[in-house]
Design a protein with these regions (language model features):
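Short, surface-exposed secondary-structure edge patches
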Residues: 12-17
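Feature captures the catalytic cores and cofactor-binding loops of soluble hydro-lyases/lyases
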Residues: 32-136
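Short, structured beta-strand/loop micro-motifs enriched in basic residues and often containing a Trp
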Residues: 1-10
Length: 136
């Protein structure tokens, strides 16, 4: 078991050095992504505003509260916390997320299935497990 300090963007060589039970500390931007976001991206063809190449995404269910729209919160929502959500329901998006957007790491809880493991192996990515309930 080893520990890795990684800074985004991450390259394929860095990811392929990781082994099961290694620990990772990430530095840089982490993008939260949930099932609804990926449905918009892959089923409805919506483009992202961000370049995800070489970055990590976290399977998340953000918690927000409604506020008056303003400069700090133009959408009318303020973030409260970001909690992990179960990765299994996002299984079908792993390969397209890596192929089309260059994502290297997916962080989530509950794990992913064989199709995702094959995608990680084929495309140079990894799944990082996180403890559920860390947003509480």
């Amino acid at each position: 078991m080893a520990h890795f300090d990684l800074s985004c963007p991450i390259d394929e060589r860095q990811v392929r050095a990781l082994r099961v039970n290694d620990t990772v500390t990430l530095e840089g931007t982490l993008f939260g992504i949930r099932d609804a976001t990926q449905i918009h991206m892959f089923d409805r063809g919506r483009k992202t505003r961000f370049d995800l190449a070489g970055h990590a995404v976290i399977h998340t269910a953000p918690n927000v509260r409604k506020v008056a729209p303003g400069p700090a919160h133009p959408s009318g929502y303020a973030p409260l916390c970001i909690g992990t959500t179960t990765s299994d329901r996002m299984e079908r998006f792993t390969r397209p997320l890596m192929q089309q957007h260059g994502v290297r790491l997916i962080i989530g809880k509950g794990g992913l299935r064989e199709d995702s493991a094959k995608s990680f192996s084929d495309l140079g990515g990894a799944y990082l497990a996180i403890i559920g309930g860390t947003a509480a």
